[in-house]
């Protein structure tokens, strides 16, 4: 390490496994931005389900060990690398990805993954925009090609992506239905765009949903837990209906015939298949949402950096929790 190198606290993962592999270190070198990169002094960092999949080693994209997790940071520009013209020191920003990892006091990010954070949104809310809102927008409008007037069911609507999907769907003039597993979750879903909400812990909710939409069925289902719901989803769809899979924790058995009569489709989505141009499109739409006011991130549990293992544990096992899980670093 070079003499005078600044040090920071950061979470490091040296092996894949459970939450216990998340180790806080206080002697990690502060990264230096290169061309088209910025260094962000992190104020808050979102914790996403995908973070837990990557940490466990079960995700298709495996980082080189050791690594620092974290994609969604919000904070202040500390320094900029060469050929960066859109940002300057002190700018309030949020990200959709990082180069060095967001569970740290400072994070590097490529300049095309960084966006201005409006003054009316605090850093916790800024850390809840990136992956949740960009994923929800991609799922609804890019993958499902949903149109005004269509019905949308968000399965698992009380989490970060689910609430983002409800807000976007309502702003785009869809009929919005949501499911959640707790009374608090159902209340939050109704407050954030859903016309109706159902308890997904009740077997009878399938019949209730069918009654709500009538014989036509549901046009689009945004699915957060496909291994549990996919078979029922296919029976809820309209003619030509689409299930967009955002999350799944395991395999599931379905009857392909359920897709044939209705000519329905099942499509997976991952934010990181988006091109730079698509990210720009998503960002423009979401920036309008911030300006108009329909984009309102909901914050759930908040943890200091040293409690990150607990944050991962709670995110994995506390189904029905409402809002985005956030780490605080200020």
Curated annotation (Swiss-Prot):
Top-level division of the source organism's lineage: Eukaryota
Endpoints of the signal sequence: none
Keywords recorded for this protein, A-Z: Acetylation, Cytoplasm, NADP, Oxidoreductase, Phosphoprotein, RNA-binding
N6-acetyllysine modification, residue list: 23
Main location: cytoplasm
Cited PROSITE patterns: QOR_ZETA_CRYSTAL (PS01162)
Subcellular location: Cytoplasm
Binding positions for NADP(+) per the UniProt entry: 53, 158-161, 181, 200, 229, 246-249, 269-271
EC number(s) on file: 1.6.5.5
Reaction catalysed by this enzyme: 2 a quinone + NADPH + H(+) = 2 a 1,4-benzosemiquinone + NADP(+)
Modified positions (Phosphoserine) in chain numbering: 248
Cellular component terms (Gene Ontology): cytosol
Entry coiled-coil feature ranges: none
One BP annotation, GO: xenobiotic catabolic process
Keyword Methyltransferase carried by entry: no
Family the entry assigns: Belongs to the zinc-containing alcohol dehydrogenase family. Quinone oxidoreductase subfamily.
Its job: Does not have alcohol dehydrogenase activity. Binds NADP and acts through a one-electron transfer process. Orthoquinones, such as 1,2-naphthoquinone or 9,10-phenanthrenequinone, are the best substrates (in vitro). May act in the detoxification of xenobiotics. Interacts with (AU)-rich elements (ARE) in the 3'-UTR of target mRNA species and enhances their stability. NADPH binding interferes with mRNA binding.
Subunit description: Homotetramer.
Record-given protein name: Quinone oxidoreductase
Lineage start: Eukaryota, Metazoa, Chordata, Craniata, Vertebrata
Annotated gene: CRYZ
């Amino acid at each position: 390490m070079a003499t005078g190198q600044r040090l920071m606290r950061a979470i490091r993962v040296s092996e894949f496994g459970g939450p216990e592999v998340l180790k806080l270190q206080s002697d990690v070198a502060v990264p230096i931005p290169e061309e088209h990169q910025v260094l962000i002094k992190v104020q808050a960092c979102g914790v996403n389900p995908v973070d837990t999949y990557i940490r466990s080693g079960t995700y298709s994209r495996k980082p080189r060990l050791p690594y620092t997790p974290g994609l969604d940071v919000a904070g202040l520009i500390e320094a900029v690398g060469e050929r960066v013209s859109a940002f300057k020191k002190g700018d309030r920003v949020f990200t959709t990805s990082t180069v060095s990892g967001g569970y740290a006091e400072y994070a590097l990010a490529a300049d095309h993954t960084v966006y201005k954070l409006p003054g009316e949104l605090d850093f916790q809310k800024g850390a809840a925009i990136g992956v949740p809102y960009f994923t929800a927008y991609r799922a609804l409008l890019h993958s499902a090609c949903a149109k005004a007037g269509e019905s949308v069911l968000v399965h698992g609507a009380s989490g970060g992506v689910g609430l983002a999907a409800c807000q976007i769907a309502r702003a785009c003039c869809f009929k919005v239905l949501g499911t959640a597993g707790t009374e608090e979750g159902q209340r939050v879903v109704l407050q954030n765009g859903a016309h109706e909400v159902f308890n997904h812990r009740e077997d009878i909710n399938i019949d209730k949903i069918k009654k709500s939409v009538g014989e036509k069925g549901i046009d689009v289902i945004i699915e957060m837990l496909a291994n549990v719901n996919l078979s029922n989803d296919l029976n809820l769809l309209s003619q030509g209906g689409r299930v967009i899979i955002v999350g799944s924790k395991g395999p599931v058995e379905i009857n392909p015939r359920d897709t044939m009569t209705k000519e329905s489709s099942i499509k997976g989505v991952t934010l990181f298949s988006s091109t730079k141009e698509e990210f720009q499109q998503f960002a423009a739409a979401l920036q309008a949402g911030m300006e108009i006011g329909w984009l309102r991130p909901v914050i759930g549990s908040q943890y200091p950096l040293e409690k990150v293992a607990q944050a991962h544990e709670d995110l994995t096992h506390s189904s029905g929790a409402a809002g985005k899980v956030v780490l605080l670093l200020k």
